[in-house]
């Protein structure tokens, strides 16, 4: 018998990287599966890296219907009263540690591309927008070199208002809720906290909470830097080719607009 050792070569290691944050009651592996069609359309242009949230939770109902055997399930934020209370500074530290861990793990695999974007679904999209806002505030107060990140854009799939505060020491005049609070109820704006880093928002027109997604788009993101994709779907990641193509096109446009390498 002839034995051969076939080494699989990862041809995305040099590509610019997009950090991906799953929804609440899900996990990194599930979100990667949900994004498979988007990855397929962009795999020669970006490397997608999927982070795992720090806190355990029950599965979100839509997740349970398809991925019930894919646990354990995790969350970034509290959305139920029975989720254990936590100090804001401890929640922020746990979230940041998760993100830095997955970055280090990807570096260890040999990846070298710049971290150019954030992509999130549902609670993960709220987190992405909040991370971008923290970066924006830090860049304004400390300068770009001391912001801790340099993401050029965000892709927010079914992300709902409001943003949450991820650096209370800098958000002294902010009306944002802190990261330890339950923030899924309708936010009563308008908000003085406006994200100007470019974003594309993806809204399913049959999503029961699309009004909250519109609120994030309209009240928390600057008109000159936001884009919108609407598709005929509910609370999930688009999978049909034409729907995914619209999202992929806007990601390419954002990358070009922001000079992402």
Curated annotation (Swiss-Prot):
GO-annotated cellular components: cytoplasm; nucleus
Pathway: Mycotoxin biosynthesis
An annotated Gene Ontology molecular function: hydrolase activity
Hydrolase recorded as keyword: yes
GO BP field: secondary metabolite biosynthetic process
Induction comment: Expression is stimulated under green light conditions.
EC number(s) reported in the record: 3.1.2.-
Disruption phenotype: Leads to a significant reduction (over 95%), but not abolition, of citrinin biosynthesis.
Catalytic residues (positions): 122 (charge relay system), 207 (charge relay system), 235 (charge relay system)
Keywords assigned by UniProt, alphabetized: Hydrolase
InterPro entries: AB_hydrolase_fold, FSH-like_dom, LovG
Gene3D superfamilies: alpha/beta hydrolase
SUPFAM superfamilies: alpha/beta-Hydrolases
Function as written in the Swiss-Prot or TrEMBL entry: Non-reducing polyketide synthase; part of the gene cluster that mediates the biosynthesis of the mycotoxin citrinin, a hepato-nephrotoxic compound to humans due to inhibition of respiration complex III. The pathway begins with the synthesis of a keto-aldehyde intermediate by the citrinin PKS (pksCT also named citS) from successive condensations of 4 malonyl-CoA units, presumably with a simple acetyl-CoA starter unit. Release of the keto-aldehyde intermediate is consistent with the presence of the C-terminal reductive release domain.
Protein family membership: Belongs to the LovG family.
Protein name per its UniProtKB record: Esterase citA
Species, as recorded: Monascus ruber
């Amino acid at each position: 018998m002839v034995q051969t050792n076939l080494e699989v070569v990862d041809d995305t290691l040099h590509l610019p990287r997009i950090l991906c944050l799953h929804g609440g009651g899900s996990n990194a592996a599930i979100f990667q599966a949900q994004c498979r069609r988007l990855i397929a359309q962009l795999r020669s242009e970006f490397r997608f890296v999927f982070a795992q949230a720090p806190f355990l939770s029950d599965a979100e109902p839509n997740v349970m219907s398809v991925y019930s055997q894919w646990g354990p399930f995790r969350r970034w934020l509290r959305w139920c009263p029975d989720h254990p209370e936590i100090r804001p500074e401890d929640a922020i530290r746990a979230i940041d540690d998760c993100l830095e861990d997955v970055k280090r793990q990807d570096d260890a695999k040999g990846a070298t591309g710049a971290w150019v974007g954030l992509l999130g679904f549902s609670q993960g999209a709220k987190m992405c927008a909040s991370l971008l806002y923290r970066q924006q505030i830090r860049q304004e107060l400390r300068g770009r070199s001391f912001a801790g990140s340099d993401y050029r854009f965000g892709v927010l799939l079914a992300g709902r208002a409001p943003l949450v505060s991820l650096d209370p020491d800098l958000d002294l005049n902010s009306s944002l809720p802190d990261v330890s609070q339950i923030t899924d109820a309708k936010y009563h704006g308008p908000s003085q906290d406006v994200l100007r880093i470019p974003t594309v928002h993806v809204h399913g027109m049959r999503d029961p909470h699309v009004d909250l997604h519109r609120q994030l788009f309209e009240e928390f993101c600057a008109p000159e830097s936001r884009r919108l994709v609407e598709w005929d779907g509910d609370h999930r990641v688009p999978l049909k080719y034409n729907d995914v193509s619209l999202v992929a096109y806007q990601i390419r446009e954002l990358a070009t607009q922001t000079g992402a390498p």
